[in-house]
């Protein structure tokens, strides 16, 4: 059969809330069995997390990200598991041959998220202002396609999309309609952590270049790219746990120390980024070990 097929049978959701932390798997058909979906309305804010190529929603970094969100702000976290369509289950040495297939599946997975969103908005009365999408690598583009589709469906825009080192190959030279783009949500936040698996291209409302967007400190000499690529997920989880611990300085002022930052020109990476007025590209110096903080006690 075709490799890495996408259909509604090959994608599932892991739902985590404070009351239900058992990370059970749901499909579109079984969603109404989740306690939260037995209610008439859902009042808490929702975050969708989407993994990338050859990954899954059960990878440690995504479990930690989900946990950080639920602990911090009482979100309902819906982790999209599209591992079959992301070629995770293909023979180890052959996975990379199927990258173009996984890349082309991103639009379908995005439309799937839009379908769930439509249900949340129409049936459960959730406001689009209360829905955020966080996607890593190919999952960042999935989130972008979801953002385009909900606008087509006249639902409005998601409040925010956070692209964690959006995939470069197959996407970086695409026009806005064929990749994650700053018009896909009210606010699009990008973390750049690798320049081969990711991309240096400006994609968002704010683009954070972590350690210049290239090799991340502490990633060593071997498998540096893969390590750097996944660091974006780890940084975001840390930024949720420790508010304002990573501060971005405008690229035009990147020679200045973080200590010179003001609320007007610098921006904190994470869920509060959009509260800061500054837009554009930012340089973020990063430590080599968790929690990676660069603020040295400074809070802007």
Swiss-Prot record:
It comes from Vespula germanica (German yellow jacket). It holds the Pfam family Lipase. Keywords: Allergen, Disulfide bond, Hydrolase, Lipid degradation, Lipid metabolism, Secreted. The active site is at residues 137, 165, 229. It is an enzyme of class 3 (hydrolase). This is Phospholipase A1. It catalyses: a 1,2-diacyl-sn-glycero-3-phosphocholine + H2O = a 2-acyl-sn-glycero-3-phosphocholine + a fatty acid + H(+). It is found in: Secreted.
